[in-house]
């Protein structure tokens, strides 16, 4: 190959990577600003800000997932300030990163750069852009995706240092959210162990084993220096979330028609890929094991999606599966493979447009579908740090202007309590940072479905009850505020303290629990 040809390939690659990086970054940045679903949109906002102020998860507030996401977001806040730009920048950077990884993966499996570029553009529209802001399920899934693609690309290579990095990504996925990576660890371990033993590649097994030991020691060290007791970490991040998963599994209902309708554009090409691969590959070849791992990854994500209560976020699998199908067609002897490839790209364009309109333009992931987004207003009217966001909350029944007025009045009431420690129970998880007043949120979310905190029937009820009481005493909290219009039940607090330890008052904006018995 001539130097001129090599330079041309490098220039083409650089051009595609540059366009992909810019497109995936700015498309996420754009759609992040359209509307707000506070309970999800701001899930990591104040919790990341609290880390910068030495309020740590597990130790200072109850957490069941999102440790890694909060820590990464606090890093963005540290560099760029605590504001909306730094918040959406985090997700936009992540969308850029995973899009580039997908492009590199596709070119590594010998897909033409142009087609890899097309598949990656589709991926960038269907991945983080559907949320636009940091979200636990997405971070957990995409860390696992990168790890999975690296595993597939490095099964037969001798770049053993990458297995340390893969293990690190698995840990990041777990500390973003415990699932789906827990399922992947169980199944991947069996497949990879059998593959490495068959190929007598014991060095990779050793590297993975010692990488796991290293990261576990690192975890214990981090907990120790931050004065987080391992027992508390175990209950909040390991044992309690396991009980949530068990409950959902016991109440799981499956409807075949609904299932196929939602996932048909994943299931059909996946079955076609499996059929083509079984026809031509040896069972234990690197290529077959790589495809098996991706099929396992896809099945795990479908199962995880069925178990979670969130909107569907796994349509990003479609362009990757189409990319793998393109590889099969390219290496086949089909007479009309060129036309089949073009037809596939047209189908993918249709699917991408369909879900782009539904999830990006209509913001379905944050439940803004059929909400009049044209009535949105600038969130900087709430506070200058929210500049760049357009406010429209699907769970507020009035106009955005009315809600902003309530939030501005709420800030004044909070300021009037500057001399006292208060606790706020709210889905508006940005008030801590914009008021510079500690809201002392006892947990990251406030739902009564058992996913936020232990209910009275849960075995960890007494543990959380003591956790909440200790927090109230330690911080000398004498008032707990609830926004009237949010209608969050008082049980979030009253289920965990005695009836004679509070009185309920109200003003124009809040219901207030005035606490006694905790001095």
Where are these regions (language model features)?
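Extracytoplasmic
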Residues: 179-180, 227, 349-518
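Specific aromatic-rich, kink-prone transmembrane helix
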Residues: 101, 140-157, 162-170, 189-195, ...
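Transmembrane-helix signature of polytopic, membrane-embedded enzymes
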Residues: 102-125
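Membrane-interface alpha helices of multi-pass inner-membrane proteins
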Residues: 124, 128, 162-180, 184-189, ...
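Extracytoplasmic catalytic/substrate-binding loops of multi-pass membrane glycan-assembly enzymes
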Residues: 32-47, 57-75, 82-85, 226, ...
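Short acidic/glycine- and proline-prone juxtamembrane loop motifs at membrane-interface regions
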Residues: 130-140
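Membrane-interface transmembrane helices that cradle and orient dolichyl/undecaprenyl
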Residues: 107-110, 145-165, 173, 272-286, ...
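Transmembrane-helix motifs of polytopic, lipid-linked glycan transferases
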Residues: 89-110, 146
